[in-house]
A protein has these predicted regions:
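Cell-envelope and extracellular/periplasmic
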Residues: 1-194
Length: 194
């Protein structure tokens, strides 16, 4: 859910004050400090990432909620990664086998994206209630029949580490681009939907 789409002027204006993002990294060029809340003006992930599915998901959610409800997102993402990157116990081994660009990207998260997500989610719980977990990942795991179990492990670890219950905090997993839209990884949707 890192966001590859180019951020256009229309994406940076009219963001509702009730839609917030917690900075996952320090971003001096945007005046953002890791662990602090800001109005959710893109980029929501790191200093130079693009538009993410969370951008308009959050905006739409805020529009449909009562005026006294805020929506906050904590977005820790690495575009092009496999779900194994978020397996806290095995991520070091996984990172060691990855290309340099990925190794450099995860440095922004202290070389452990899961740990950073957990750290920020604990901080977010001080300001509100976690109501759901969004996942948009799968292209790099295309064809991996074990993907649902790997995602389940990450989800269950988050629930455990944050003292959450699955009945209260659903996991919402998005599909990848469909075949009729020239999605090269469209076959993964069958696995995502299991």
């Amino acid at each position: 859910m890192e966001g590859n789409a180019k951020i256009e002027a229309q994406d940076t204006c009219n963001v509702n004050e009730r839609f917030l993002m917690m900075a996952a990294v320090d971003c001096p060029s945007l005046g953002r400090v890791k662990g602090q809340w800001y109005k959710a003006v893109p980029p929501l992930v790191r200093c130079h990432t693009g538009l993410t599915p969370a951008d308009y998901f959050g905006r739409t959610l805020v529009e449909r909620l009562p005026d006294n409800i805020k929506v906050g997102v904590v977005n820790v993402a690495v575009g092009g990664c496999r779900i194994e990157l978020f397996d806290e116990e095995n991520c070091e081994e996984h990172i060691a086998s990855q290309p340099e660009w990925l190794k450099n990207t995860v440095k922004a998260y202290g070389n452990n994206p899961y740990r950073r997500l957990k750290e920020l989610a604990v901080e977010a719980q001080k300001a509100g209630v976690i109501k759901g977990i969004l996942l948009h990942q799968g292209e790099s795991n295309t064809g991996d029949k074990e993907w649902p179990q790997k995602v389940k492990r990450v989800y269950e670890n988050l629930l455990r580490d944050l003292n959450l219950q699955a009945k209260d905090v659903p996991l919402l997993a998005g599909e990848v681009v469909h075949a009729d839209q020239n999605g090269r990884c469209a076959s993964m949707n069958e696995i995502i939907n299991t």
